[in-house]
Amino acid sequence: MKDLKSIKKLKILLTDVDCVLTDGGMYYTSDGDVMKKFHTRDGMGANLLRKSGIPTIIVTKEKTKIVRRWAKKMNIEHVYDGIQNKESIIPIIMKKYNVKTSEIGYIGD
């Protein structure tokens, strides 16, 4: 029951990309360009959260057009990419969205 109370406080979900929104595989074109495989259901989850008033924000170490393109297609408003220390972005998000740490969920490493 305690966990359900925590979920009700959720106002924002932060998520990593690799091994969370992708299968973690490394794919390359014949020209050596990197590709990622996203699952459609992950986008559906982000949409359900958005419709409930809970934005999903991507925070990732990588800086690729692929992630931004997928996020745009899935109506994910914000992508913080190239973030080497993911914890460093939390105060910025807290200020921007006027939330406490107890109201932020995170999926990733």
Where are these regions (language model features)?
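Non-catalytic pre-domain segments flanking phosphatase-related domains
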Residues: 1-17
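Short coil/turn segments at beta-strand junctions that form active-site/ligand-binding loops
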Residues: 9-11, 54, 102-103
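Chalcogenol-based redox active-site neighborhoods
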Residues: 20, 32, 73-74, 99, ...
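A positional/architectural concept
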Residues: 21-51, 61
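Substrate-recognition element of Asp-dependent hydrolases with the DxDx(T/V) motif
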Residues: 46-70, 80
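Feature captures the catalytic cores and cofactor-binding loops of soluble hydro-lyases/lyases
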Residues: 65, 83-92
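Short hydrophobic/aromatic-enriched beta-strand-loop microsegments
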Residues: 76-84, 103-106
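Conserved Lys-Pro-Asp/Glu-containing loop-to-beta segment of HAD-superfamily phosphomonoesterases
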Residues: 90-109
